[in-house]
Each structure stands twice: as structure tokens, then as C-alpha cells.
């Protein structure tokens, strides 16, 4: 959601005591609405006039692996459980983890995300995300725009590397992509910088150690199961904050106040839809925006092959609305 090449212009000092400020007194803020089950974080930039103090969070003192559960053990239990007993056998976070695992088991997966960010000064920014899985290759597009700035990113992952394109244009649902506007990194390098590779089906850590059980639930709705997950705003975002910082070239990692995810699963524990809501503080260009809120709604389809868009092909977001 940001223009990474944006350089604020300066106005002349009117007095000796007055410091130089950017012409707009602005910052580019990462808005982190993220794909809950399949995707990379959808980060974006917002122009804000909001000078506030920033309390940074030392995520480096926390080890990601310490907050993740044993997936193999859970999957083994899941495969031995009768489908009519899912709700009584598994906790909300276990159901979410199984559903995310099931996403990875489909050869073809598609997720379309439609979101909105609300920030200080009444600034609003649209969010679009498009994710495709085709066997062991992955595509992800993130487009987010306000009236002033936006960010356009495409990611293509194969067996060995991730190729990242930075697009141009102001349209809220498409961009111009050029071959010269790309970088390629190995998958380990990408995961180190961005928090997770595209084959990992979420940026968030949803586990026994990151889920607030007294504020989470799983209920039956016809043949579906509806999950309401309140996550710890510190430990659940250890991967996610890397993505936000890399996407928007932030001064520091954002500090989260709230992470809530609603998920609807079918009777086979496939994800039908998700809605993510977040509140956080973020700092860029030395300026802080507090209590930025964002939401993203995603819909999922499976087992329908769709070719990855080339640089002249736009993603179709109409089916996600």
C-alpha cells in the first residue's frame, strides 16, 4: 500500500527556529492486512499527517519456532478422527491449523482478497490480493491504493527462488508490470526477509501459544464450522512483521494491538472464507501513525487450474467482491 520510491520534498524554513519538514508532513505507513490461510501479507502505504511517539517492539528476543505447534502430530490425529467429531475433538486453533494444512494439500488453490484500511485524518485505502497455487509453484499479487499513493507487488515462486515485481500505476485493481522492475532471491533469503515463503499458507502463527482461548470459539453453522480467533498481538505476528517491514521499507517493525481472524470452513475443513481485522502502530520516515486499522475478506476456490498471470495480464477481482 505504499510508493516505495516516494521522496517528500522540503519547504524552506520561515524562521531559524523552525525545522525543515516534508512538504506534506507525511509518512508512508504499512497497512498489514494479511491473507489468513494462504497468503503473503498484503502490505500497503498510507499518507498521514500524524506526528506521534513510537514504542518499538523487540521481536528479536522471541524465537518463531518456540510459538509454533507440532503440525505432524496434529495432522496424524486429524486423519484418525471421524468428520462428525471435528468440533468436539479439536480446539479452535487446531481447526484453523488443520484447515491451513488442507489448503496446502490441494494441487490448485485460488484466493481473492478485498480489503480496506482506515487510518488517521480519515485516510482510507483499498486493498486487493490475489493468490494462486499450482502444484509446487505459487503466485501472489498485492495492490493497494489511496488517492495519493499506492503499492503494486507481484511474487512468483518456483522450486528454488522467488521473483518480485514492482508495478506502476494508480488503478486500484491493476498495474503496469515490466521485466526490468524485478528482483529474484532464493527461497531461504526470501523467508528470512519477508517472514515466510509462499508455500506456507499464512503469515500469522496460530497455535496453542498464540491463541487467546477465552476469547476464541468454534461453532457449527449448518454443514460449516465458523471459527472466531483472537490472537496474541505480540507472538502471533513474529513472521508477519517481517513482511510488513520489507514491503514498506519501514523504520522499525510495527507494534500490534489487536489481531482477530474469522474463518468459515466446510465439512471437510477446507477454508471457504476468512476475515482478518488488525490494529497497530507503525513508523516510517521518522513519523508514527497510531491505531491504524485494516480488514481483509478472502474467498477460496479449489481444484480449478488457472494459469499464472503474465506481465500483460490483469487479475480479475470481481469474483471476490
Where do the protein language model's features map onto the residues?
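Short amphipathic beta-strand and strand-loop transition segments with alternating hydrophobic
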Residues: 129-130, 208-220, 262, 303-306
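Flexible, processing/modification-adjacent segments and terminal tails
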Residues: 163-224, 229-230, 234, 238
Amino acid at each position: 500500500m505504499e510508493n516505495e520510491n516516494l521522496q517528500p520534498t522540503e519547504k524552506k524554513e520561515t524562521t531559524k527556529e523552525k525545522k525543515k519538514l516534508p512538504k506534506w508532513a507525511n509518512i508512508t505507513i504499512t497497512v498489514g492486512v494479511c491473507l489468513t490461510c494462504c497468503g503473503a501479507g498484503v502490505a500497503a502505504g498510507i499518507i498521514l499527517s500524524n506526528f506521534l511517539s513510537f514504542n518499538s517492539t523487540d521481536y528479536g528476543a522471541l524465537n518463531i519456532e518456540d510459538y509454533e505447534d507440532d503440525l505432524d502430530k496434529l495432522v496424524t490425529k486429524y486423519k484418525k478422527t471421524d468428520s462428525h467429531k471435528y468440533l468436539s475433538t479439536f480446539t479452535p486453533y487446531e481447526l484453523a491449523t488443520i484447515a491451513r494444512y488442507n489448503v496446502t494439500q490441494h494441487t490448485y488453490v485460488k484466493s481473492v482478497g478485498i480489503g480496506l484500511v482506515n487510518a488517521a485524518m480519515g485516510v482510507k485505502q483499498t486493498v486487493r490480493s490475489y493468490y494462486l497455487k499450482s502444484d509446487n509453484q505459487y503466485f501472489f499479487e498485492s495492490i493497494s491504493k489511496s488517492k495519493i499513493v499506492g503499492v503494486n507487488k507481484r511474487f512468483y515462486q518456483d522450486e528454488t527462488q522467488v521473483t518480485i515485481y514492482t508495478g506502476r500505476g494508480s488503478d486500484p485493481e491493476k498495474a503496469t508490470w515490466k521485466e526490468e522492475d524485478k528482483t529474484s532471491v532464493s527461497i531461504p533469503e526470501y523467508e528470512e526477509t519477508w517472514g515466510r515463503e509462499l508455500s506456507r499458507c499464512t503469515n500469522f502463527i496460530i497455535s496453542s501459544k498464540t491463541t487467546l482461548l477465552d476469547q476464541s470459539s468454534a461453532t457449527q453453522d449448518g454443514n460449516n464450522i465458523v471459527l472466531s480467533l483472537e490472537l496474541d498481538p505480540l507472538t502471533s505476528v513474529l513472521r508477519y512483521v517481517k513482511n510488513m517491514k520489507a514491503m514498506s521499507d519501514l523504520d522499525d517493525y510495527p507494534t500490534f494491538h489487536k489481531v482477530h481472524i474469522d474463518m468459515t470452513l466446510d465439512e471437510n475443513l477446507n477454508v471457504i472464507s476468512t476475515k482478518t481485522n488488525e490494529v497497530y502502530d507503525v513508523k516510517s520516515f521518522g513519523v508514527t501513525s497510531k491505531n491504524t486499522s485494516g480488514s481483509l475478506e478472502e474467498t477460496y476456490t479449489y481444484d480449478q487450474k488457472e494459469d499464472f498471470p503474465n506481465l500483460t495480464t490483469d487479475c480479475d477481482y470481481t469474483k471476490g467482491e
